[in-house]
Amino acid sequence: MSATSEVFGGSSRVFVAEAVSLPTAIITAGFLARRFGPDDYGLFTLTVAIVAWLEWTLTSLFARAAVKHIADAHVADADDWRPAGGMVLRVFAITGMLGLFVLWVASPSLGALMHEPSLSRHLRLLALDVPLFMVTQAHQQVMIGTGQYGRRATVAAWRWMGRMVLMLALVSAGFGVDGALAGIVGASVVELAVARSFVKPRVGDARRGNASAMWSYAVPLFAAAVSLRLFDRLDLFMLKGLGAGAAIAGIYGAAQNLTIVPGLIALSVTTLLLSTLSRAIRLGDDAGARSLVHNALRGVLLLFPFAGVAAGASTGLATLIFGARFAPTGALLSVLIFGAIAVVVISVASALLTAAGKATWALIAALPIVPLAVAGHLLVIPRYGASGAAVVTMTVAAVGAVLALVAVRRAWHMWPAIGTILRATLATTVAIVVGSRWTTSGAMVFVELAVLSTMVILLLIVTGELTPRERQLALSRLGRSRPLSFRTK
């Protein structure tokens, strides 16, 4: 199997499993938005955003270094991942407990900063999720580093299904916002149990692990990871901190929640890309490695036309899911979706640079975005509010994406094909223009999304971007994905 096929096959399995979050998240978000109203939904969104930001920040500090460390050990000896896995488990567990402590102590101050006194109680409840989340992530890095993509996909599917069931059940029972947060914690317990049934790294094995090998990658990636995580949800935090009410935060948070697909793609692809590319380089498969880099760059550009589809149908989609009171969410979504795709470009570029041994070059794209975003939000939010925050986020993310591509060009001497750029631009423009002139509501929104997506795919085929072999590969891989099954190859 080629390196590109391995990544496509593995990431398609993980994406299909993570894509379970789409219907579950839409059902859950729509239920909670109608049940809570803009004010309580805004408070819920703010709580989840803060804790999720902390969890993914802590994970991103070590995830790529952990995958590369385990993948290198696995290539050297298929059974030699246990010391590396034990080291990863110990680091993630300690970090999770520290995160719980910091969030517990800081919650009153965060409530005061956001002008929401009740936020402190909600944060302390959801803080219990941090160590559970981190330990589960350690198990997932082991699965990815050892090539167990199907099992990684199964774990993801259980998480999203468990979260939806528990949240809806507890809120329906009358537990309100606290019930929804408790459902998230309960889903993490389920996810950890499933992950543990597949792989069992032990902290005791870490004594035999080579800690310096992991830290050699973790340290240079630390600053880049912190910067990217600070950028994530920075717009929502600054919007609220600069005086926006809970209702505005709820509307803005709803728009952010609808940008979930790019995040799923980044989650599905980047660590698998790093694992496979690292193995190809270590095995001396230079041709396979370069082909994989080329296809990774091409793939992220082809996400933009589908962002255009979402932008064109944004208002109808927002009102269908959240209700008429969330109609302003549509305009915000049409901007934020492109910023989310730009962040995927940065994430993929970071994986390519890390695999090439140029982890410090990831700083080129990551470091400038936070100060640029802070300056932009301070200038724009007081005058333009939520719409200004969305534009600043998209613009800064685009700058970071360009810088990331420049760094990849220096490391791999490769640049996205001009033809791909032009065809992606054409398809994106057509999707936006047609979608903006086609007004739908209710169930017809799904018809609009299907028609626009089909139109984009046909455009890419007609213009020669997608070859018959690529279409066949995509259909075969997706057809073989079984994310809910415990049986894996």
Task: Locate each region found by the language model.
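Hydrophobic alpha-helical transmembrane segments
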Residues: 124, 153-201, 217, 367-375, ...
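Transmembrane helical elements of multi-pass membrane transporters/channels
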Residues: 9-26, 180-187, 191, 195, ...
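Helix-loop junctions and terminal segments of transmembrane helices
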Residues: 59-76, 144-145, 255-298, 350-355
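N-terminal membrane topogenesis motif
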Residues: 1-25, 79-82, 86-87, 119, ...
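Membrane-proximal transmembrane or re-entrant/amphipathic helices at the cytosolic face
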Residues: 436-489
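Alpha-helical transmembrane segments of multi-pass membrane transport and lipid-handling proteins
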Residues: 86-114, 165, 169, 173, ...
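Signature of the first transmembrane helix
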Residues: 5-64, 91-104, 219-242, 449
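Interhelical loop/hinge segments that connect adjacent transmembrane helices in multipass membrane
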Residues: 1-7, 177-178, 193-233, 272, ...
